[in-house]
């Protein structure tokens, strides 16, 4: 194998791995609010394949820099709400609050079919803390659900057009609104990094150059 062919093979393998990594993780911004301005990224939700086959991991991060200061103590997320694909309801008992494990903070619990407030409506699941257990980072794992994928948890309730995720975030400065907490929601996909697109474009050009070279021989 010549150097050109080997380079093309390495590039193809690298792009495949990058594509696989991207396929195994999806991220969304919560950029809507009933208290602060819409269109600002207030929190980021990442859903990914777990380390254990079949598990799905959630990471929910409050983007602290988006909030008016000074921040209180404690500041952070107090609830987080999300949905699942209703196809997972079969077989009966396939999915429920008991499938959500390894919650951190560990004082939080899971409730079902709760209203997120702020006009954002009901969600299938809500991870819930309290005023003293607010957090800037929530993580948990969904385990033991047959047939789910990361996409099973990125949709509106019952497949509708509502927001995918919602959170109650509290403890920021009152600012001009007079409030120190609000409801936040969103389903805006985080853009794929430009480097991935550039790499993919480069690989396509490399493949075209190789074909032209072969045709000229």
Where are these regions (language model features)?
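C-terminal membrane-anchoring or membrane-association module
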Residues: 207-217
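A short, hydrophobic C-terminal helix/tail in secreted or cell-surface proteins
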Residues: 191-209
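Sec/Tat signal peptide C-region and signal peptidase I cleavage site
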Residues: 19-23
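Bacterial N-terminal signal peptides that target proteins for export
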Residues: 1-8
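Positively charged, low-complexity intrinsically disordered regions
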Residues: 7, 184, 211-213
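Mature extracellular "passenger" or substrate-interacting domains of secreted, surface-exposed proteins
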Residues: 24-189
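Bacterial N-terminal signal peptides
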Residues: 11-18
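Detector for intrinsically disordered, low-structure N-terminal pre-sequences
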Residues: 9, 100, 189-191, 216
């Amino acid at each position: 194998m010549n150097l050109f062919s080997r380079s093309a093979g390495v590039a193809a393998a690298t792009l495949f791995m990058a594509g696989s990594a991207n396929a195994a993780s999806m991220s969304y911004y919560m950029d809507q609010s009933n208290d602060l301005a819409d269109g600002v990224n207030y929190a980021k939700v990442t859903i990914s394949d777990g380390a254990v086959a079949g598990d799905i991991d959630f990471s929910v991060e409050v983007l602290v820099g988006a909030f008016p200061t000074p921040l209180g103590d404690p500041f952070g997320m107090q609830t987080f709400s999300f949905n699942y694909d209703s196809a997972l309801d079969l077989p009966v008992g396939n999915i429920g609050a008991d499938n959500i494990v390894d919650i951190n903070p560990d004082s939080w619990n899971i409730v079902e079919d709760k209203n997120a407030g702020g006009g954002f409506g009901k969600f299938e699941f809500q991870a819930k803390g309290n005023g003293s257990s607010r957090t800037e980072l929530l993580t948990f794992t969904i385990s033991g659900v047959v047939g789910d994928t990361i996409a099973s948890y990125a949709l509106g309730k019952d497949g509708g057009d509502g927001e995918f995720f919602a959170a109650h975030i509290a403890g920021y400065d009152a600012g001009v609104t007079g409030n120190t907490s609000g409801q936040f929601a969103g389903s805006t996909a985080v853009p794929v990094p430009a480097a991935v697109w550039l790499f993919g474009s480069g690989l396509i050009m490399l493949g075209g150059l190789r074909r032209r070279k072969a045709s000229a021989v």
